[in-house]
């Protein structure tokens, strides 16, 4: 049901987007303008030097985000936030903490991609901090085009990255996992399928084998991070910052850099950099989660969810439902029950049940 709704949403939204772009262009430039736009999309759908083509491509992906959230809601899979985390919502506090490792990786990627500290890179420090025009050539776009592209990237790319995370590491992984009764098998299959599908759907972008391995490695480690943190927050940030940096560095359209070359579509060096930085990001997120004592548990079907402090009548963070039904497999509760005047006289009112940790 949810998948059918998403497919329908995607088809209708793409038709609307196509009409919104092609009709005005056809009216102003005639049939040749429409043909040129089609050719531009076919040759470089994510060309950062063409704001029209780039915005069309990004918007066509961004619309998937509200689509998947509505699909989950309409299909009654659960609240829309069920894809966000084990708390059925975006954990904004945890998201803020994840900015630390995200910015560290962004800084490392900036140094690597610009070749900051070696000859022949995009940026030179010889006599000052400036673009190395001898290596990358001159910008081929106007200031107005560059400004438009940067605004589009900053506004749309975070939602584009979030849409892909919610589709692949949220909906697809949870759906596949729910089909398999053996939890460990379901988890492995969910990670494998989501990673393979994520990588294969990037083939139309022109990636070669190394480029697909690059994307696949990114997707695999992102899937593991989602399982380890119980949510999409860390991977959405990682995905967004990674894509923003790529687009920003390419936006000037440097004359000395051929984005259609074989090396631009993937190299073994690029794959190793992505693999290394992704593993480093996972490690930093793991340490941060342990330090912050991140709650990666998920509530059972009967468990109530509260915004803010847990009410006194709920009996504390570990809930005891009627007849012993509540959260699943928690350690026995030793603290006093709600409403007890004397902790020494307090005793559990039911068999303790609680929460299961995420893998």
Residue ranges and their predicted role:
Residues 14, 18, 69, 73, ...:
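Short helix-terminus and kink motifs of transmembrane alpha helices
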Residues 1-76, 260-359:
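N-terminal, membrane-interfacial amphipathic/helix-forming hydrophobic leader that caps
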Residues 2-22, 99-107, 233, 237-242:
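Hydrophobic alpha-helical membrane-insertion segments
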Residues 17-56, 114-146, 200-210, 251-271:
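Membrane interfacial helix motifs at helix-loop boundaries and amphipathic/re-entrant anchors
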Residues 56-58, 80-163, 173, 178-181, ...:
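Juxtamembrane helix-loop-helix connectors linking adjacent transmembrane helices
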Residues 149-309:
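Transmembrane helix-loop-helix hairpins at the membrane interface
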Residues 74-95, 170-185, 189, 306-319:
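Cytoplasmic juxtamembrane regions at transmembrane-helix boundaries
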Residues 4-5, 52-56, 60, 93-101, ...:
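Alpha-helical transmembrane segments of integral membrane proteins
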């Amino acid at each position: 049901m949810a998948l059918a709704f998403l497919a329908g949403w995607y088809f209708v939204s793409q038709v609307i987007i196509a009409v919104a772009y092609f009709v005005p262009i056809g009216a102003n430039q005639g049939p040749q303008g429409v043909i040129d736009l089609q050719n531009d999309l076919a040759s470089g759908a994510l060309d950062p030097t063409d704001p029209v083509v780039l915005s069309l491509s990004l918007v066509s992906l961004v619309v998937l985000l509200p689509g998947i959230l509505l699909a989950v809601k309409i299909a009654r899979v659960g609240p829309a936030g069920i894809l966000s985390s084990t708390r059925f919502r975006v954990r904004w506090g945890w998201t803020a903490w994840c900015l630390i490792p995200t910015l560290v990786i962004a800084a490392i990627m900036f140094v690597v991609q610009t070749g900051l500290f070696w000859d022949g890179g995009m940026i030179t420090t010889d006599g000052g901090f400036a673009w190395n025009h001898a290596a990358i050539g001159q910008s081929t776009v106007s200031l107005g085009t560059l400004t438009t592209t940067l605004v589009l990237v900053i506004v749309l790319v975070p939602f584009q990255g979030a849409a892909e995370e919610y589709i692949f590491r949220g909906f697809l992984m949870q759906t596949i996992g729910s089909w398999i009764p053996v939890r460990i098998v379901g988890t492995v299959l969910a990670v494998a399928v989501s990673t393979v599908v994520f990588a294969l759907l990037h083939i139309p972008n022109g990636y070669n084998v190394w480029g697909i391995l690059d994307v696949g490695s990114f997707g695999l480690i992102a899937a593991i991070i989602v399982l380890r943190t119980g949510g999409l927050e860390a991977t959405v940030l990682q995905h967004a910052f990674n894509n923003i940096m790529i687009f920003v560095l390419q936006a000037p359209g440097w004359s000395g850099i051929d984005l259609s070359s074989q090396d631009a579509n993937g190299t073994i060096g690029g794959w190793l950099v992505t693999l290394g930085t992704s593993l480093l990001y996972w490690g930093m997120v793991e340490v941060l989660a342990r330090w912050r004592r991140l709650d990666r548990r998920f509530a059972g079907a009967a468990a109530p969810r509260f915004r803010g402090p847990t009410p006194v009548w709920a009996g504390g963070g570990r809930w005891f439902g009627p007849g012993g039904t509540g959260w699943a497999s928690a350690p026995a509760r030793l603290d006093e029950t709600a409403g007890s005047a004397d902790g020494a006289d307090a005793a559990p009112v039911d068999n303790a049940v609680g929460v299961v940790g995420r893998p």
